[in-house]
Design a protein with these regions (language model features):
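Structural preference for solvent-exposed beta-strand-turn elements
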Residues: 1-147
């Protein structure tokens, strides 16, 4: 797997994924985020088995593939990098490298095979409903918080 994307774009989505992940997981794989690169799109997934997050961002896919990496470390590395394009590559032995394009910086993380990542359960169609933005805002404005 190899893909290139803009640092700020992926960092924003990884930040949201990190909020989903609990700091005290019973399974170590739940501290990871799943990255699936194919057809010029990167799918990012995170779960704590109760709440799940999935998003897609446009990327330049050189080689399609999938892996999972420790979300907190990935986010820390992304925050330390300068803005611009970043190359992500999965190498031998699930070694996941992160390299800013045109910079001589190289980070490596150990990935875990994606087949160990739990499947995200989707709600059935009958559990969804549509709500206008105005109605939603009106309901939120009528909410009272008690302490």
């Amino acid at each position: 797997m190899k893909f290139i994307c803009e640092r700020d774009t992926i960092m924003k989505e990884i930040s949201v994924a990190q909020e989903i992940i609990s700091s005290k997981n019973s399974m170590s794989i739940l501290s990871n985020v799943l990255l699936d690169a194919r057809e010029e799109t990167l799918t990012i997934r995170a779960t704590d088995l109760r709440v799940s997050f999935e998003t897609r961002i446009p990327v330049e896919v050189v080689n399609a593939g999938t892996t999972t990496v420790f979300c907190e470390k990935l986010l820390g590395i992304l925050r330390s990098l300068p803005s611009g394009d970043v190359e992500f590559e999965l190498g031998e032995g699930n070694s996941f490298s992160i390299n800013p394009v045109f910079k001589k910086i190289n980070f490596e993380l150990k990935g875990i095979e994606s087949d160990k990542f739990p499947e995200i359960q989707l709600a059935s169609e009958d559990q969804y409903f549509e709500l206008s933005q105005a109605a939603f805002i009106d309901m939120i404005s009528q909410t009272i918080f008690a302490v």
